[in-house]
C-alpha cells in the first residue's frame, strides 16, 4: 500500500558495464551511448573503461541520467572493477592495492 504523500521510488533500467572511446577496446562516442540508452529506456549506466575513469567522469557531466563512475583496473593478477569511484586508479598494481584504493574512494569492488 502506498501512503498518501509518499513518493514511489523510480525504477532503474541499467547497464552496469559500458565502455566508451576512452577505453582501448571501444571507439563509441559518449553522445552515441547517451542516444542509444534513451532509445532503450536505460536510465542508469556504469561506465567501466579499461585503465581510466575519465570517460565515466565526462559521461557523468553530460548524461541526462544516472552514471556510475567505474574502471576496469589491470592488476598484476588480472582485472578488478571498481565502481562508484572519484578518480582513476593506476594499472599494474597488486589486487590487494587495487582493492584498498577502490575502498579508499568509497567504492565497490567487483570481480568481472
Name each model-derived stretch.
Residues 2-105:
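A metal-dependent hydrolase metal-coordination microenvironment
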Residues 105, 111-112:
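Active-site-proximal loop/helix segments of hydrolase catalytic cores
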Amino acid at each position: 500500500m502506498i501512503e498518501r504523500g509518499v513518493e514511489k521510488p523510480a525504477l532503474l533500467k541499467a547497464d552496469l558495464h559500458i565502455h566508451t572511446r576512452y577505453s582501448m577496446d571501444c571507439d563509441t562516442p559518449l553522445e552515441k551511448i547517451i542516444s542509444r540508452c534513451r532509445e532503450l529506456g536505460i536510465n542508469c549506466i556504469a561506465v567501466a573503461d579499461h585503465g581510466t575513469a575519465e570517460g565515466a567522469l565526462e559521461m557523468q557531466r553530460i548524461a541526462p541520467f544516472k552514471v556510475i563512475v567505474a574502471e576496469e583496473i589491470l592488476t598484476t593478477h588480472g582485472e578488478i572493477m571498481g565502481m562508484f569511484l572519484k578518480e582513476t586508479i593506476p594499472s599494474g598494481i597488486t589486487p590487494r592495492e587495487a582493492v584498498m584504493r577502490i575502498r579508499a574512494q568509497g567504492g565497490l569492488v567487483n570481480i568481472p
